[in-house]
Swiss-Prot record:
The keyword Transcription regulation does not apply. Belongs to the transposase 25 family. It comes from the Bacteria. The keyword Signal does not apply. InterPro entries: IS66_C, Transposase-related, Transposase_IS66_central, Transposase_TnpC_homeodom, Znf_dom_IS66. Keywords: Plasmid. This is Uncharacterized protein y4hP. It comes from Sinorhizobium fredii (strain NBRC 101917 / NGR234).
Length: 552
């Protein structure tokens, strides 16, 4: 480095060139360091996947030798298979990152994972030969005297509604009679690097795993029953590539969601496999859906995964958001509402379905009759009255669903406000007369302490009475827990969040997720970065409809 005045060139140009050369040298060193770190991470992820794969083999051999058929052993094998699935996908993601980092240098060789040799396709599988139109002139000199030299064949496994075929993409080679140069059409893009699985089949694998909650080991078993040998690690490899490929779309959906003026937010539990035990993680979702008040913005949902429910997670998610947040009364949201820390503060609108549910649990006659702990206890008349009052409010909401925000607000001011004001007066009066041991104190305090947030629907017609939009978005996670039991790792939960984002957003826009995935995975590799917005589900739907109209 140039550190002494005597080392500096006399002329300004020389000094500039020296500084520029030093800057470029530092950039090169930084790129090398980043590439080496990425390679090290890729090697570490590969070794972790290898260790779990060997543990799985050992456990299977031990089971065969000792004849163990216990439920515990079967569960252990399932856990190892799911953990291996997540580690292989993580190793593939790290390999992609290492390749990208190494491409920026000329001295660091990218780490490449060792993969098992792919087994040949069955002899009786259907094959379709697709010949790319060859060049008519020499790509070197422009001559037209071409003669066929040979051909390269790329085999891609594709799905045709549970019927499989191998597409042989032929690229014929031609040699020029004039200059002896060889001409050949460039190889086509694959949905994933080095991928031998077509976009339609890849879309099915992704949708079955994240949309229908079928783990990859079950999918592998199903493929084997149909005569196709695709191991769990092979499928996980493709899932890792596909998730990385879809990240730009995830980022665009994220930007769209947090640009909304009003959001629904909620979370649910998700068991995450750790080294020694399962931890209780969380899946968070934020949904923008303006259809209840006639809004024209496309609906969308974004998901995140975390290892716990600490408030730092939603605070990080919503750090750049300003507007209305409809949620439950989780106190982890509270710090983000401080106006001094945000240009546009967050205003909370609490869910009345949560509040009503607390009263309903004390007024549910059938449930109380089944509950041994409450046997003999009378139904709370206050809770029953609160449920009846809420039912009147919800009936008004059903009548104004889909109207404009202004129309909704006008109806609420006329019909809902008198009911809600009277409810506040009644709850305050009843609360003052209750003893500390009364069970109904909890739901009353739940509302009275947060009354401003519960009353926001009377001031803004955009606000919904419930947070059902977010709860519906998390319903698939609750259903999935019954099938896959737990996420194989934290990174596996993160991948699930990415795929849930695109699949749920497709569903919110009445789009077949498999059709969208198949088309986007086939196009995204060579789609211009400046036009990535065209792949957003609602833009894709608009373009598809226009294409159908032109064809008609």
């Amino acid at each position: 480095m140039i550190s002494k005045p005597v080392d500096l060139p006399v002329d300004v140009v020389g000094a500039y060139l020296a500084l520029r050369g030093e800057h470029e040298a530092l950039q090169a060193k930084h790129a090398i360091a980043v590439a080496e770190a990425a390679n090290a991470q890729a090697m570490l992820s590969d070794n972790e996947a290898l260790i779990v794969a060997l543990e799985l083999k050992i456990e299977k051999l031990r089971r065969e030798l000792r004849g163990q058929r216990s439920e515990r052993t079967a569960r252990l094998l399932d856990q190892l298979e799911l953990q291996l699935e997540e580690l292989v996908a993580a190793a593939t993601e790290d390999e992609v990152a290492a390749q990208a980092a190494s491409a920026r240098t000329s001295s660091v060789r990218s780490f490449t994972r060792k993969r098992p040799v792919r087994k040949p396709w069955p002899d009786d599988i259907e094959r379709e030969r697709v010949v790319i139109e060859p060049p008519t002139t020499c790509t070197c000199c422009g001559g037209s005297r071409l003669s066929k030299l040979g051909e390269d064949v790329t085999e891609t496994l594709e799905e045709i509604p549970r019927r499989f075929k191998v597409i042989e993409t032929v690229r014929e080679k031609f040699t020029c009679r004039d200059c002896e140069a060889i001409s050949q059409t460039p190889a086509p893009f694959h949905a994933t690097p080095r991928g031998f699985i077509g976009p339609n089949l890849l879309a099915t694998i992704l949708f079955d795993k994240f949309g229908m909650h079928s783990p990859l080991n079950r999918q592998s078993a199903r493929f084997k029953c149909e005569g196709i040998d695709l191991s769990t690690s092979t499928l996980a490899d493709q899932v890792g590539y596909a998730t990385a490929a879809l990240m730009p779309v995830f980022d665009l959906i994220e930007a769209h969601v947090f640009a909304a003026e009003r959001l629904h937010g909620d979370d649910t539990t998700i068991p995450i496999q750790a080294r020694d035990k399962c931890t209780t993680g969380r899946i968070w979702t934020y949904v923008c859906d303006d259809r209840p008040f006639g809004g024209t913005a496309p609906p969308a949902a974004i998901y995140y995964a975390s290892s716990d429910r600490r408030g730092e997670h939603p605070q990080k998610h919503l750090a750049g958001y300003g507007g209305i947040l409809q949620s439950d009364c989780y106190n982890g949201f509270e710090p983000i509402a401080v106006a001094a820390t945000k240009a546009v503060p967050i205003t909370f609108a609490f869910c009345h379905a949560h509040a009503r549910r607390k009263f309903f649990e004390l007024a549910d006659i059938q449930k109380n009759a089944r509950d041994r702990k409450r046997r003999g206890k009378p139904i709370s008349p206050i809770a029953l009255e609160a449920v009846k009052r809420y039912d009147e409010l919800f009936e008004i909401e059903r009548q104004i669903n889909g109207l404009s925000a202004e129309e909704r607000l006008a109806v609420r001011q006329e019909k809902s406000k008198p009911l809600f004001d009277d409810m506040h007066e009644w709850l305050t009066k009843e609360r003052a007369m209750l003893s500390r041991s009364s069970e109904v104190i909890e739901p009353i305090d739940y509302m009275l302490k947060r009354w401003e947030g519960f009353a926001l629907f009377l001031k803004d017609g955009r606000v919904c009475l419930t947070n059902n939009a977010a709860e519906r978005a998390l319903r698939s996670v609750a259903l999935g827990r019954r099938n896959w039991t737990f996420a194989g790792s934290q990174r596996g939960a993160d991948r699930a969040a990415v795929m849930l984002t695109v699949i749920t957003t497709c569903r919110l826009n009445d789009i077949d997720p498999k059709a969208w995935l198949a088309d986007v995975l086939a196009r995204i590799a060579d789609h211009p970065v400046t036009r990535l917005y065209e792949l957003l589900p609602w833009e894709w739907k608009r373009a598809s409809a226009a294409t159908v109209m032109l064809a008609a």
